[in-house]
Amino acid sequence: MNYLEIENLHMDYDNISIDFSATLEKGKTLVIVGHSGSGKSTILRMIAGLLPSGKNAKIHLDNKDITKLPPNKRDIGMVFQSPCLFEHLKIIDNATFALDCKGISKKQRHEIGKDWLKRFGLDSMEERLPHTLSGGEAQRVSLVRTLIAEPKVVLFDEPFSALDAPLRKKLTADLSTWQKELGFTAILVTHDIEEAKKLGDKIIVMKAGKMAWEGLPEEFEEELL
């Protein structure tokens, strides 16, 4: 049974016309691959409500029409390529920012945040500022900041592409573990073929804004790009 249904997303920009539809079961991962400029990141932003999705678009999540809801009401989280942490806030406050927006008290936020940071191996960094972190540490804080709100769907826009290969491999493995533990449904944009095959339950290839191929990871070959 489909948990997430995306129909007729459409946008015209930069001499490209983007069209996209997809379905996904609960707890599964859809991976979107394609060359730069094929519309992958734009699609994620349309799903998240950060960009208009077109007049005929429909997005249903858990049997609820979320097409016209604002981003903060969609129950969708997003992790970007750059961590985009607030430089003036300590890690504990960066990690719990979504809880602050929900009006949860500072004491309760920090109690929840400490548990999450420990889960992600960041418990010794609560009082540090973002500029003192490595790239991998900062991206893990970004993951915590998104997942702590317990969204039903998480969108990942090449979250590990700026990291070195060993760290990227480790965080890819960690992401699979976290998804099983937390139970979220995911859409991942990546250029990494092995990452796509390892994490995806379904893969879609985008070319110049159009869906060029859709299938299972074991059927996917690099020549399809």
Report the location of each language-model feature.
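ABC ATPase NBD coupling module
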Residues: 65-80, 101, 106, 110
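A short, proline-enriched helix->beta-strand linker immediately N-terminal to the Walker B motif
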Residues: 148-152
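Conserved H-loop
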Residues: 183-189
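Conserved ABC ATPase "signature" region
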Residues: 65, 107-125, 176-177
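Conserved ABC ATPase signature
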Residues: 129-133, 137-139
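Catalytic Walker B motif of ABC-type/P-loop ATPase nucleotide-binding domains
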Residues: 154-157
